[in-house]
Amino acid sequence: PEGIKDNDAIFTEQIALAVKSLGALETERGDYVAILGANTLGIIAAELCIYYQLVPIVIDVDETKLSLAENHGIYYTINPSKADVRQRIIEITGGKLAEFTLYEPRSNMLPNYIPSITQEGGTVAVIGYNYFLSNLQLNLGDVLEKQLNVTAVKNGYGEFNTAINLLANKVINTEGFIDSVIKFDDIDRELPRISEDKY
């Protein structure tokens, strides 16, 4: 559509996935949403939280990614190598922990944080669309003990129009998501380098 740059449009699927993921949580204004991973999808989900008047808390071990999240307006970020994640979330939420947690397996964050940061009876959404993930391990005893609701969202089906509308209205800021642009003629030369990069 007119008014949307190509470099923004390539994130339509991730925006649609984030919209669908937050919709699956049945949040209310002011709820806290812990997001495990400050990758592109995690930051987009956090931006949407702010738009929906939720309070995102982004958790990642990569300071560069956390800085990018902060540049996108995310106020609460936690680096587990620098702070006790559970204690910090207790401070942020006034002792009640996060009502909701989003976990994106490609973020390289461990799922074992989920029970310690999500309040009893809270909801966890495992989100993403990478079908080549290794097995994920989460202690179901902890999930049962806290009576957590677990759901999964693997695509943004049904939310593309919403995603396009959010881009057109500049709700989502994609600045910093693209490291470099490669010209078509340079693909053969650049492919070995970019195939080694982790995203």
PLM feature segments, named:
Residues 29-32, 98, 121:
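Phosphate-coordination loops involved in phosphoryl transfer and adenosine-cofactor binding
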Residues 108-169:
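Glycine-rich phosphate-binding loop and adjacent beta-alpha segment
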Residues 26-27, 93, 105, 117-119:
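A generic alpha-to-beta junction signature in SAM-dependent methyltransferases
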Residues 101-102:
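N-terminal Rossmann-like NAD(P) cofactor-binding module of classical short-chain dehydrogenase/reductase
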Residues 1-6, 147:
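Glycine/charged-rich beta-loop-alpha catalytic/anionic-binding loops adjacent to active sites
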Residues 5-82:
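Mid-domain Rossmann-like dinucleotide-binding core that forms the NAD(H)/NADP(H) cofactor-binding site
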Residues 83-95:
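Short amphipathic alpha-helix with an adjacent loop that forms part of the alpha/beta core around
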Residues 112-116, 157-199:
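C-terminal hydrophobic helical "lid"/dimerization subdomain
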